[in-house]
Amino acid sequence: MKGRVLVTGGLGYIGSHTAVELLAQGYEVLLVDNLSNTRASVLDGIEAISGKRPEWLQIDLADPAACRSALEGQHLDGIIHFAAYKAVGESVQEPLKYYQNNLGSLMNLLDYVSQHPSCGFIFSSSCTVYGQADQLPITEDAPVKAAESPYGNTKQIGEEIIREVAVARGLRTIALRYFNPIGAHASARIGELPLGVPQNLVPFMTQSAAGLRGPLSVYGNDYPTEDGTAVRDYIHVVDLAQAHIMALERLLAQQNEEALEVFNLGTGKGSSVLEVIHAFERATGASLSWDFAPRRAGDITAAYADTQRASAVLGWTAKKSLDESMRDAWAWQMALG
């Protein structure tokens, strides 16, 4: 066994795929998830893929007493912290809920790590910290701009809290700034499982093509891009999960050069909404109904990653294509029925 790793939000989209990769690499995995944005059945999918059923605790990490009780005596080598509320629109309506949950859970976990400084800590951050960057592709040194939402602000503030605590307590920590995760495990046993109306492009697209939703709305066709639609960096969730393993290995080997290291995770290539639609139809043979709608407030024109630091330092690069991501997302949708 390589080590014992806690994955918070471990039954969520990225957390479940990371748990599968950890198990495949020989780690012992402990999952924590309060099921606020997923279902317990994801555990069955993890077991079906890996042949192992990791321990799962259903607790609220934002509750200091519950968090302390759950982690007491766990002897963790690493924590990968995904658990967070993540709906941008809801965060604008209910900012206090987002600050209490996202920052409360983070601080409770850091309290544990501060008492166990040999435990590496990986934070699920986001490219939202950059806003509309002045230059593309976006490097990790690009200025962090005022957040567009309380959700985005919890990622910015979260990074600062981690940095200050890590410096003060001599901790080893990494923040991974994701671009746009898509796709699903090739087995179609786990994938993105939005409760209610999907907030992200690809699950809405697959549900629409499956006849579960009406036509897809493409928000904005007047952006200063080649086809007028917004451009993002779409990365396969399995590539993303594997980056967490490489980041964890860096921390466990005590190779980090700063108390908090930051890495972008993306493909380095931007794709417009229309390009994603065309890739979906090309890769799956399914047809999609869509129409243009006005831009959404807060949406930026374009964002895609400079991934040189992750490549040079972690030895990680995204391998899966947009078409492969579309095929896997569609297979997952078909498996859901």
Task: Annotate each PLM feature.
Residues 93, 101, 145, 168, ...:
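A generic fold-level signal
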Residues 13, 149, 177, 192, ...:
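Amphipathic alpha-helical recognition patches that constitute DNA-binding helices
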Residues 114, 192-197, 298, 317:
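A general boundary/transition motif marking the beginning of the first structured unit of a protein
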Residues 1-184:
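N-terminal Rossmann-like NAD(P)+-binding domain of SDR-like oxidoreductases, especially those catalyzing
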Residues 187-189:
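Catalytic core of nucleotidyl cyclases, primarily class III adenylyl/guanylyl cyclases
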Residues 99, 148-156, 191, 195-199, ...:
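Short-chain dehydrogenase/reductase
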Residues 201-337:
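C-terminal substrate-binding subdomain of Rossmann-fold SDR/epimerase-dehydratase oxidoreductases
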Residues 9, 57, 69, 81, ...:
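Short, flexible active-site loop motifs that bind/organize anionic cofactors or intermediates
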